[in-house]
């Protein structure tokens, strides 16, 4: 998803009950993944640990119509009377969902319209280290989150960054070994 952020920020397999599942979205913090994959951060760590790894594989650069993982177990593509159909129906009934709005994948670096998702900037920070850049997420226009913890992540080609909110420094962070994003997880909005 592009521009969707869920709290608390958690990392894990999309097949588990992660925030956003009930509304068929994926958090733009990009810390979740399908059971057969990993996050970009995990993939890069393996590449950096094992320099003999020749490259990486990204499935896919663009979101696309079809394979709405983790929501591909919905009723739209299943034959009634099968175990898969019955399991999907039970899950949707528990969530009180009558229609499944999900029709596209969530894997892309760009969305269906070609707009850059937050993960675009994460990939750019790794793939183009010579290009000075920083991308801060999430957006910062949530009056309803006042007083609540709202983690801030920074994707940067630099080695470190300092986060300021309303002119006040929340400190500098330096990328550690096998760290590809800078995180301020205790920021209060």
What positions do the PLM features span?
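Extended substrate-binding grooves/exosites of carbohydrate-active enzymes
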Residues: 1-174, 181-189
